[in-house]
Amino acid sequence: MSKIKLYLDTNMVHDLFVNQANALKKGIEHNKPKKFTFLLENQEKFEFVTSFLTKAEIARELVSAHNIRPDIIEQFWTDFVSILKQKYIDKFEFDEQIVEIVYKTKMKLRTMVNFFHLFIAIREQAYFVSGDKPIINKAKEIGLYDKLLTYIELQKLAD
């Protein structure tokens, strides 16, 4: 059976990095969040994809909110990509498609940024997995893409 390709956006992995940052500050072992544990336990079913956009959002959070040095962030990121054997997208060209989408529907800035993640998932022909329901709902509403999953739907798919 072939693996299901999943694009992991920032909110799918955010907790992992925040836990690592907090553990580093306290000098303790970090707890693996349930989402990440689920991904680890289901590696035989899924192929994972992430991108520079996820990395940038994670890095922004770790630098701004947790004062983590870039070299530490790079190590966290390298471990994350390696553990899940992910394909890493290091560049992507966006175009006027986002303008057309914002003309069609009202959305918050966060949702618009998540459309950039969705565009990468579309190019990779991967399921877009997000805990951000507005992006899922908006993409369905405008008929942009049909491989859209919440984390709960992903869990059901794994069963």
PLM-predicted stretches and their roles:
Residues 15-17, 61, 138-139:
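Residues that scaffold the ATP/ADP-binding catalytic core of kinase and kinase-like folds
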Residues 85-137:
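Active-site neighborhoods of divalent-metal-dependent phosphate/nucleic-acid chemistry enzymes
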Residues 8, 50-53, 94, 130-131:
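A conserved hydrophobic position in a structured secondary element of the catalytic/binding core
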Residues 59-63, 103:
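Amphipathic alpha-helical segments within well-ordered protein domains
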Residues 1-51, 65-74:
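Short, well-structured N-terminal submotif of metal-dependent ribonuclease cores
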Residues 67-88:
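Helix-adjacent hinge/juxtasegments
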Residues 1-7, 25-26, 118-159:
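Acidic, PIN/NYN-like endoribonuclease modules and their adjacent C-terminal/linker elements
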Residues 13, 55-58, 135-136, 154:
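A generic structural signal for short hydrophobic patches within well-formed alpha-helices
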